[in-house]
């Protein structure tokens, strides 16, 4: 396998700290990073270089663990170990914290906007997932507290085109939720990982979900049978593929490219890997191959990988070493 990941640039994003997470805005013109230094940094392209456009340093008292852009690109949400979630509004080049969401008992581990932009999900070490509703006046109201997990909840992500929410937990499981008669309910539990599930990502259609774990595997789950049209019966999610034997340590993040279908992973062995579904593989029993492997992508654990929303071959990663890196992926011939 020839080396198909090329380093474009490396940036010291959060010096002397961990860089925890990266998020592209919907148009791909800005990249938000967050870290153990309690800041969020907004990066933009200046010629060929990524430069820091602004530092959001006033919102949080502790580590900022995750950031998420609203679908319109005008708001950024940040989840922090200080048990709060800040909502930042973009005004020209600057960002202003317009509200702080409180209620979790301790560290907020993740935050995610629904595709509609009117719902926000947060999750915490307090084992709960909260769903917030946003109205026209930019007021945020908690509409549901979900206590389905028995341990720390690490990550939340929304289905790309329906209001279905997924969460990953230290209890080794993944839960799916949807709204039912004005309340949110857990509609499925995905079990199979043998240790903490760190992250998860839907494919472009939302029919498949990739999950990654402390058990060193990535699992691909597929939605089978959605019941009769219009019926309320829950789709059945089944593990259709397990990527095992590739990662030597915890897999901290997985990201599904919505333009090409390639899957990127971030691992505790300091490496970034790319997987692609094999041509002609059976959708109900898909097979994937490792198509790129960058062993020393960073000098410490890789925490996050994220594909650019518009440029199909551009990937960003970040690490405990405080750096973020930009990669060009070339599909092997």
Curated annotation (Swiss-Prot):
Family: Belongs to the WD repeat CIA1 family.
InterPro entries assigned: CIAO1/Cia1 (IPR028608), WD40/YVTN_repeat-like_dom_sf (IPR015943), WD40_repeat_CS (IPR019775), WD40_repeat_dom_sf (IPR036322), WD40_rpt (IPR001680)
Extent of the WD repeats: 14-53, 59-98, 103-142, 148-187, 192-231, 246-285, 297-333
Protein name per its UniProtKB record: Probable cytosolic iron-sulfur protein assembly protein ciao1
GO terms, biological process: iron-sulfur cluster assembly; protein maturation
Entries under HAMAP family matching the protein: ciao1 (MF_03037)
SUPFAM superfamilies, per the entry: WD40 repeat-like
UniProt source species: Xenopus tropicalis
């Amino acid at each position: 396998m020839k080396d198909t990941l090329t380093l474009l640039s490396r940036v010291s994003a959060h010096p002397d700290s961990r860089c925890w997470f990266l998020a592209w805005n919907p148009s791909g013109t800005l990249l938000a990073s967050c870290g153990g230094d309690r800041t969020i940094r907004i990066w933009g392209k200046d010629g060929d270089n990524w430069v820091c456009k602004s530092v959001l340093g006033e919102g949080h008292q502790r580590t900022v663990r995750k950031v998420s852009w609203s679908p319109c690109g005008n708001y950024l949400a940040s989840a922090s170990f200080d048990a709060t979630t800040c909502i930042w509004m973009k005004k020209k080049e600057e960002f202003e914290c317009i509200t702080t969401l409180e209620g979790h008992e301790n560290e907020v581990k993740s935050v995610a906007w629904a595709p509609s932009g009117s719902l926000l999900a947060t999750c915490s070490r307090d084992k709960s997932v909260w769903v917030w509703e946003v109205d026209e006046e930019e007021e945020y109201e908690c509409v549901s507290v979900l206590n389905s997990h028995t341990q720390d909840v690490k990550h939340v992500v929304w289905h790309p085109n329906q209001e279905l929410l997924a969460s990953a937990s230290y209890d080794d499981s993944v839960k799916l939720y949807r709204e039912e008669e004005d309340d949110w309910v857990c509609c499925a539990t995905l079990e199979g990982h043998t240790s903490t599930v760190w992250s998860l990502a839907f494919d472009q259609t939302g029919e498949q979900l990739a999950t990654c774990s402390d058990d060193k595997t990535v699992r691909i789950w597929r939605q089978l049978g959605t019941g009769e049209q219009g019926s309320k019966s829950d789709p059945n999610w089944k593990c259709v593929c397990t990527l095992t034997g590739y990662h030597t340590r915890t897999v901290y993040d997985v990201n599904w490219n919505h333009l090409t279908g390639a899957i990127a992973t971030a691992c505790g062995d300091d490496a970034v890997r790319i997987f692609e579904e094999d041509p002609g593989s059976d959708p109900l029993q898909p097979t994937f191959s490792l198509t790129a492997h960058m062993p020393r992508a960073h000098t410490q654990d890789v925490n996050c990988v994220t594909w650019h929303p518009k440029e199909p071959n551009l990937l960003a990663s970040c690490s405990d070493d405080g750096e973020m890196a930009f990669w060009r992926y070339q599909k092997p011939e």
